[in-house]
Amino acid sequence: MSIVRRSNVFDPFADLWADPFDTFRSIVPAISGGSSETAAFANARVDWKETPEAHVFKVDLPGVKKEEVKVEVEDGNVLVVSGERSREKEDKNDKWHRVERSSGKFVRRFRLPEDAKVEEVKAGLENGVLTVTVPKAEVKKPEVKAIEISG
């Protein structure tokens, strides 16, 4: 059985030439204990926006269950999103024509700014999108004291 992966769906000619690193990639997973199938999923797409009240992270995790995701804060200011998407069980009688969905472990880390209230982080998973909200501490405006000028 052979599985055909298209490396770039926007370039139909990308698969015409052999990748000189394919041999290396097939060896590396055995050494590192990983899987070449995790490569695309390891780079889960993330949007990070800042609002006046919070930092909001949106992570695309299609097909991942809530129980397969962890959201943590390490070292006081590093947001870590990690987890694993299980591989579909294979039946010996199945014939695969294309495998494009990734499986395996993933991890993303983000250094949070100083104004992040890490003790109030909230996360929710809906429709394959993980939303992590990190509230911001209120920035106190410096007090201005008028000084009377004598003379």
Curated annotation (Swiss-Prot):
Transmembrane segment boundaries: none
Domain of life the protein comes from: Eukaryota
Molecular function per GO: protein folding chaperone; unfolded protein binding
Gene Ontology cellular component annotations, sorted alphabetically: cytoplasm
SUPFAM superfamilies in the cross-refs: HSP20-like chaperones
Coiled-coil segments: none
A GO BP annotation: response to salt stress
Annotated sHSP domain residues: 37-151
Record keywords, A-Z: Cytoplasm, Stress response
Disulfide bridge partners, by residue number: none
Localization per Swiss-Prot or TrEMBL: Cytoplasm
PROSITE patterns registered for this protein in UniProt: SHSP
Protein name: 16.9 kDa class I heat shock protein 1
Species of origin: Triticum aestivum
